[in-house]
Amino acid sequence: MGEDGFVTPPRREETLGLLLGFLGVAIFAATLPLTRLAVGSLSPQFLTTGRAVIAGLLAIPVLAIGRRAPPWRDFPRLALAALCLVVGFPGFSGLAMRGLPAAHASVIIGALPLATAAAGALIDGDRPSPGFWICAVAGSALVVAFALHSGGGALQAEDALLLAAVASAAVGYTLSAQLSRRMPARDVISWIVLLALPVTAPLSFLWRPENAASVPGSAWACLAYLGAMSAYLGFFAWNAGLARGGVARVSQAQLAQPFLSLGLAAWLLGERIDAETGLCAVAVVSLVFVGRRFRAGSAGRQISGASPAQALPLRRT
């Protein structure tokens, strides 16, 4: 048994789990840069609903092949998770990305693991140590200070939207973690996006571009990636990695995400990463790392009878 309460996986399984975990992180790291690229041609509303429609359509054959019965007793929790993960996070971040560089946004979103752990304490009954809370408060203060400094002493509306996106994702991941103790994690994300489909499909039609032919192919490619990978299939690699390598070990892979996002922002968007942004990203990731160390004893908590494969990651979008 490992310190996180799970059976320690064989080294080969652990290595495979880490590789899958890094694959999931790499998939998610492109979310903000591609959103920034797409909102130049597609509205945030269409981008939010369109990616959800793509994910929902992909979920139909997955659930049909598995012959999964609708989890009616979990409908309220699934609906709230869908509100947070299908509408809240992509909607708020999409609106924010109209006026913020992807590099700037990557620093703020880098605090998501701490926010998710805090949501787990408030909603799911986790009891992190005082050291974790110190890191959480310090990380939050650092993110707010970075936003204030970048905004000339005032919090920009886009920064407030990003903070709302972080809060939405944190609550959504916590609710998903609760649901994952009752059903496989892939079914949780599948039901979440499928449940939202009757709402997102007509809204995406309503908010579609007036002249779709004038939208560049790069914007459509970004939408396809966000829907298929960021909103759906990315969770498959991430969840499989957690199941094989252990939650406490593989979850450390997400520490690389802000740096991958910064690199993609520079490569895809030509954004200049100044020393201030880079140093702040390092500081936020360091606080996340230390905070996770403090809460290692409770990070792998699970209900009796639930397997590691059913534990949803404390991570996105």
Q: Which ranges hold each PLM region?
A:
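Transmembrane alpha-helices of multi-pass small-molecule transport proteins
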Residues: G2, G17, S41-G88, P113-A119, ...
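Specific transmembrane alpha-helical segments of multi-pass solute transporters/efflux pumps
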Residues: A26-L32, I60-I109, A145, G227-G245
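Glycine-/small-residue-enriched transmembrane alpha-helix faces in small-molecule transporters
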Residues: M1-T49, G91, L95, G151-Q178, ...
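Membrane-interface helix-cap regions at the ends of transmembrane helices
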Residues: A30, L34-L37, S41, A55-W72, ...
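C-terminal-most transmembrane helix of multi-pass membrane proteins
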Residues: G2-P10, L19, G50-A52, L148-H149, ...
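Structural signature of hydrophobic alpha-helical transmembrane segments
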Residues: G40-A55, G94-L112, Q156-S168, G217-A231
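Helix-helix packing/entry segments at the starts of transmembrane helices
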Residues: T48-G50, P90, H104-A111, L175-P198, ...
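Hydrophobic transmembrane alpha-helices of multi-pass small-molecule transport proteins
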Residues: A59, A79, A111, A119, ...
